[in-house]
Amino acid sequence: MRGRNRIAVSMCTQLRGGLWRGASGVTAIELVIVLAIIGILAGLSLPAYRDHVLRANRGEARAALLSLATAEEKFYLQCNEYTSALDAAAATACSPASLRFPTASERGYYTLAVTSADAIGWTATATAVSTLPQYSDTRCRTFQLTSAGAKTARNSGNSANDSECWNR
């Protein structure tokens, strides 16, 4: 029995002080390697995340234009004409005086306007606000919706980009 106890005590002593004696912390080279890996991962993931956020915010423009279309049709039912007046300041003689619709999207990333309206139709536009991050979305800067249901979009170079902007 004495022999077994000596082996057990010897193993515990080795584990306690012998094997782990030199491992007291993290070396500088290990820290540099970890920081380099974190930097590489961040460099790869942040642009993809930013692109995802810009694409997600495009939904705000689409939703605002569809809500504006509903408001225009409601106005037409009451006044027998369409209007380009979104707020009461640009009121017409018909009651309600205007659409009483906000001139900005829900979170304010897009400015809304009815660029043309008459007795037979309208064209609504949502444009990214130049002072906000959504303006850096160069692929889908301006969205348009007409009373006929035509959906168009323009990129920062004013070229058509309908399928990417309206279908995603």
Predicted segments with their positions:
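Periplasmic/extracellular, small/polar-rich flexible segments of pilin-like filament-forming proteins
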Residues: 2-6, 77-168
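N-terminal single-pass transmembrane signal-anchor helix
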Residues: 22-49
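Conserved hydrophobic beta-strand within the GNAT/NAT acetyltransferase core sheet
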Residues: 28-31, 72, 126
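Outer-envelope exported proteins of Gram-negative bacteria
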Residues: 64-67, 127
